[in-house]
Amino acid sequence: MLQLIAIGEILFDQIDGKSILGGAPLNLALTAHQLLQRFGGSCIPVSRVGNDDLGNTVLQELNSRNVCADYIQVDPDRPTGTAVVTRTEMDHSFTITEHVAWGFLAESQAAIDLEGEASAICFGTLGQRSSASH
């Protein structure tokens, strides 16, 4: 069975008064899972969200799409990640909120075991900027 793992940030883009679920690893996980499940495969996200409304929204969205949420840690102290998107006529920029849950993804034996079963692993770049997640 083909199994992919997407490790890294889960966040909400705050744009024009709306919150849009994203983060490159999660976007990959959702799209790849939809494609792979047709062939008996899956893509599993590994990340960390806050114990807050946005974190609950992430878990509900994964559940509604039949994506495994077993490797999503819930941080009791830090919020779910956000990125404020500022748009202009010609461009847009992102302000990534710091000290959020995904930046403190903790090592777990379950995730290590999962990685041993994976056909491929994708790492998000934002999640690699914190030494806590290395």
Write out the residue ranges for each language-model feature.
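Positively charged, low-complexity intrinsically disordered leader regions
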Residues: 1-19
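A general structural signal for well-ordered alpha-helical segments in protein cores
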Residues: 4, 25-29, 55
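Conserved strand-loop elements at the edges of beta-sheets that form or border functional pockets
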Residues: 6, 22, 74
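Conserved N-terminal subdomain of the carbohydrate kinase-like
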Residues: 12-14, 40-125
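Short catalytic helix/loop segments, enriched in acidic residues and glycine
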Residues: 19-36
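Residues that cap or flank secondary-structure elements
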Residues: 20, 49-50, 129
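Short amphipathic alpha-helical segment that frequently serves as the phosphate-/nucleotide-binding helix
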Residues: 22-26, 59-60, 134
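Glycine/threonine-rich flexible loop motifs
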Residues: 127-134
